[in-house]
Amino acid sequence: MNIGIKSVHTYCPEYFLDNFEQSKKWGVEKDFINNKIGSIKLSRMKECEDTTDIAQYAVENLFQSNDSLRSKIQCLIVVTQNPDNGGLPHSSAILHKKLELEKTCAVFDLSLGCSGYVQGLSIAKAFMESQGFKNGILVTADPYSKIIDANDRDTALLFGDAATATWLGENPLWSIKNCDFGIVSDKYEALQVSNSKLVMKGREVFNFAAFYVPKSIQKVLNDSGLKIEDIDMVLLHQGSRFIVETLARRLGTEGRTPFSSKNYGNTISSSIPMMLAELNLHTSRRILLSGFGVGLSWATCILEKIEK
């Protein structure tokens, strides 16, 4: 059994914050928004909505494209750090009810941030293969609008809300190959919640990513017997335009490492699957994914297209 990615579907709220407009209260120049942050708009779910609502919208988009899939789902995994009801019950249980999935479906949450999608792929693949499950869904939904301090320049200009649903199963489009994981836990305070609001030490997070992510990518390449030239696209967590472009220069992959969150912001664990869904990857044979952030943790893997 080879469980891999069959398709990826997304949901991005219709309401957005204008980053140029809100940045005026700090006297931030447009050039800083364009060239450093990179996101001119930040997506926001409605005040009446919660994490499982936007997660449901993403999964329903998947089901609309695959009519008979709902009754075949055997595993539902939700990656979030901002669950409904403070996390009890787990958001995957609430989402399971909203989606009306079978009672025999295994459901659980993963409390992971920016590295969550790649870690979730590895966990879901291993879990499904060990149990002989043929169809599962990995959901990412982490609306940071629930914890953003609107008066904190360091965080208010960065994050957007979105959700994704990745269908995992047999006969996939993308096979999940070598992975690498790690954490520098003595730096966890660089990105945490304090007094119910997100607090970030941006320089520490940047230094962490700039040092550890290239090493992780090189390890995965070495373990795979590949060189960076063998990778068609490098999809990095969309922390900001500055960190994505800095890493691309260090890796020598400027033309293959897109910044694509201009119109919705840093969507945490959803940023990488958003790219998988939106970018034209038809000519790509190998894609490298690397998520990094909260923990401070990283997770890197290679996807390889299955030739039909």
Regions found by a protein language model. Give the residues of each.
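Condensing-enzyme catalytic core mediating Claisen C-C bond formation in acyl metabolism
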Residues: 1-48, 150-207, 211, 215, ...
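Conserved beta-ketoacyl condensing-enzyme motif
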Residues: 5, 51-108, 226-244
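Acidic-glycine-rich active-site phosphate/pyrophosphate-binding loop
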Residues: 26-33, 86-101, 135-144, 241-253
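Glycine/charged-rich beta-loop-alpha catalytic/anionic-binding loops adjacent to active sites
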Residues: 39, 75-78, 97-111, 147-149, ...
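Short, well-ordered amphipathic alpha-helical segments that serve as non-catalytic structural scaffolds
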Residues: 51-66, 209-224, 272-275
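Claisen-condensing/thiolase-fold acyl-transfer catalytic domains that form or cleave C-C bonds
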Residues: 52, 56, 83-84, 89, ...
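Short beta-strand segments
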Residues: 79, 111, 136-142, 168, ...
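Flexible, glycine-rich active-site loops centered on histidine and acidic residues
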Residues: 129-160
